[in-house]
Amino acid sequence: GWPAYPGPNGIRSSVCQTKLGCGKKNLATKGVCKAFCLGRKRFWQKCGKNGSSGKGSRICNPVLAHAVEKAGKGLIKVTDMAVAAIVKYAGKK
């Protein structure tokens, strides 16, 4: 299934950054963190609440959606590679 939509406020990059504590523990992660949050925002904007608004787009799949949200909750370590993938996908028209 599709993960719960964080809501219009929840997908905001600034809210995401605050939640993740971007750059608090390690300043080097701030850029990566910001990029991730922006990618996550674009992902949700593109795919909508349940992925239906992104029909025909390969990025709008439940696997990626869950990965984005797990990373966003800090359950998995956000690696530069994962972030790069999310940001790259999210940037695709």
From Swiss-Prot:
Entry keyword annotation includes Secreted: yes
Family recorded in the similarity comment: Belongs to the worm cytolysin family.
Cellular component aspect of the GO annotation: extracellular region
Keywords: Cytolysis, Disulfide bond, Hemolysis, Secreted, Toxin
Protein name listed in UniProt: Parbolysin P4
Any one of the GO BP annotations: killing of cells of another organism
Disulfide cysteine pairs (residue numbers): C16-C37, C22-C33, C47-C60
Subcellular location: Secreted
Membrane-crossing segments per the record: none
GO MF annotations, alphabetized: toxin activity
Keyword rRNA-binding tagged: no
Expression by tissue: Localized within the skin and proboscis and are most readily isolated from body mucus secretions.
The protein's role, per its UniProt record: Cytolysin that shows hemolytic activity (on bovine erythrocytes, HC(50)=5.75 mg/ml). This hemolytic activity is completely inhibited by small unilamelar vesicles composed of PC/PG, PC/PI and PC/PS in 1:1 molar ratios (with at least 100 mg/ml concentration).
